A protein has these predicted regions:
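Extended catalytic cores of very large enzyme megasubunits
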Residues: 2-431
């Protein structure tokens, strides 16, 4: 579309011509040059090809009107992308236009580092310590075949939000200049190579995920083919031993898994309850809450490689005598030192508890320091051990089962947390 299109009046033509003579942009090398209005218009028109309902001239003129003298070319590119995205509420195809404009920016960023093929992208990653040795050798051995596999036009399948997320969080970046060293298609093929044993397998998988018909989980996308190929989404950890060494070792385990985008599920049943005797110091325990507060801060600090917040869920048995304090952890009121806003919470419920809820019977709460064996039992073995401990009178206190169940339901309704998970059903089906 020419700049003198009938939809642009004489005044607009004159104003854009004046812009081209008075406005300048700063190139990557620092030089200033006059704004080339026609170049901006042509760039938007190319990306708008085949998108019904999209007016490229509208985007171009709005972009030009938003320029300031001395803006960098990167700021100009970002302005055109944001301008397109602003029109998405009027016409959904502007999302694809914004995505295509962003794709050209990504491509330019990669090529400005003298990366013109998939194998060169991987070589750069190897040089910077980002790519694992097995994938490096795999790509070097099959470079020509893998390079020929890339289908750049598949970038056009992205909507804007999807491609922006890929650009911001998933593409590998140079450790020093923070520029991306792979395009979306290089990224997909790198993931495929990390999951494959031969070139044909990698190519088939690349074609599947680059078509967006299927995508692996985020940790796989983050880490496949890299020097830290931790690709599982979730890790379930047993309760730490009831000691300083045991608790801090579990903190370390969780931090290392979270570092490479693993979500954590961890039990906390073995840690002694509030008021329990600490024989080493002859003091009394503060219970599980201070430990979970520390874990909450750790999860927030180790933010999955800077890509997103860490995620962890703590499970607690319903017979633990700190269960009521546990259910208050996500409340928005109360002592902030006894609240954990980053952790997720889950109740680990035996069938015996639900039977007592149904019958409106009492439920006994125990200090795990006195009944350490209950943690590892389920089904009939748990029931007999629980009843034996109850008959021996070693519980801390008793409450109506329905009262505790009501607190669980209230916590779940008010905070969306305190998930209901069933110990016996889970173990009987999995073990």
């Amino acid at each position: 579309m020419a700049l003198t299109d009938e939809r642009i009046g004489d005044t607009d033509v004159e104003s854009t011509e004046n812009t081209s003579t008075t406005m300048r942009v700063r190139k990557r090398n620092g030089d200033l040059e006059a704004v080339d209005v026609n170049k901006i218009v042509r760039a938007v028109e190319r990306c708008a090809d085949g998108l019904p309902g999209v007016d490229p001239m509208r985007v171009a003129t709005r972009t030009i009107s938003g320029l300031c003298d001395g803006a960098t070319t990167e700021e100009l590119d970002e302005l055109s992308i944001r301008t397109s995205a602003a029109f998405i509420v009027e016409e959904p195809n502007y999302s694809r236009l914004a995505a295509r404009l962003l794709a050209t920016v990504v491509d330019k960023e990669v090529r400005n580092q003298d990366i013109h093929s998939f194998s060169q992208s991987v070589a750069m990653g190897v040089e910077q310590g980002l790519i694992g040795p097995e994938v490096a050798e795999f790509v070097a051995t099959n470079a020509r075949k893998l390079n020929d596999t890339i289908e750049d036009e598949r970038d056009h399948l992205f909507e804007f939000f999807g491609l922006r997320t890929v650009y911001d969080r998933y593409l590998l970046r140079h450790p020093e200049n923070r520029m991306v060293i792979e395009t979306p298609q290089y990224f997909f093929l790198r993931v495929a190579c990390g999951l494959s044993t031969c070139p044909d397998e990698a190519i088939r998988f690349y074609r599947l995920i680059s078509s967006l018909a299927y995508l692996p989980s985020s940790p796989t996308l983050f880490n496949s083919g890299t020097s830290h190929p931790q690709m599982s989404s979730c890790y379930l950890l047993d309760s730490p031993e009831d000691s300083l060494d045991g608790i801090y070792k579990r903190y370390t385990d969780i931090a290392k898994l979270s570092k490479f985008a693993g979500g954590i599920g961890v039990a906390w049943h073995r840690i002694r309850a509030k008021g329990s005797l600490i024989r080493g110091t002859n003091g009394l325990s503060n219970g599980i809450i201070p430990w979970l507060k520390t874990l909450d801060s750790s999860v927030a600090a180790v933010n999955q490689g800077g890509r997103r917040k860490g995620a962890a869920c703590v499970y607690l048995e319903s017979w633990h005598s700190d269960i009521e304090d546990f259910l208050d952890l996500k409340e928005n009121t109360g002592d902030p030192q006894r609240r954990t806003h980053n952790l997720n919470l889950a109740n680990w419920i035996p069938d015996l508890f639900m039977e007592r809820v149904e019958k409106d019977w009492q439920w006994s709460l125990f200090d795990p320091a006195k009944v350490p064996h209950l943690t590892d039992l389920y089904g009939s073995d748990f029931e007999s051990a629980y009843l034996k401990a109850e008959e021996a009178g070693i519980y801390e206190r008793q409450i109506p089962a329905r009262e505790l169940y009501s607190r669980m339901m209230r916590s779940l309704a008010q905070t969306g947390n305190g998930w209901m998970t069933f110990k016996d059903a889970s173990n009987l089906k999995c073990n």
